[in-house]
Amino acid sequence: MRHYEVMVILDPDLEERSVSPLIENFLSVVRDGGGKVEKVDTWGRRRLSYEIKKKPEGIYSVIDLQAEPAVVKELDRQMNLNESVLRTKVLRPEMH
C-alpha cells in the first residue's frame, strides 16, 4: 500500500453539516478496497485564487490515506462524478 494525500474542494453552497457525510461516503471506497484513512482535515470555506465553475470560494478538505493505486484511482473517479466536488488533487507526499 502507498501513502496518498487527497485535497478536495467542495461546492460552497453545501451546508456545513452535509460536508462530513459526503466525505465519509467517498472514503467508503477506500475502506472497501482494503485501504485505511489516517486523517481527514476539513479547513472550511476558503476564497479561491480564481473562480471554479463560477464559484469564488470553496470548502477545502485534506485526506491522508494508505491504499493501493487502483483504489485511489477509483476514489478520484467517484469524486469527479459528484457535482458537489469542484476540484480534486491526489498527491504522493515525499517520505523524509
UniProtKB/Swiss-Prot annotation:
The keyword Ribonucleoprotein applies. Pfam families: Ribosomal_S6. NCBIfam families: S6. InterPro entries: Ribosomal_bS6 (IPR000529), Ribosomal_bS6_CS (IPR020815), Ribosomal_bS6_sf (IPR035980), Ribosomal_S6_plastid/chlpt (IPR020814), Transl_elong_EF1B/ribsomal_bS6 (IPR014717). PROSITE patterns: RIBOSOMAL_S6. Belongs to the bacterial ribosomal protein bS6 family. One of its GO terms (biological process) is translation. GO terms for cellular component: cytoplasm; ribonucleoprotein complex; ribosome. Keywords: Ribonucleoprotein, Ribosomal protein, RNA-binding, rRNA-binding. This is Small ribosomal subunit protein bS6. It comes from Streptomyces coelicolor (strain ATCC BAA-471 / A3(2) / M145). Binds together with bS18 to 16S ribosomal RNA. It comes from the Bacteria. GO terms for molecular function: small ribosomal subunit rRNA binding; structural constituent of ribosome. The keyword Nucleotide-binding does not apply.
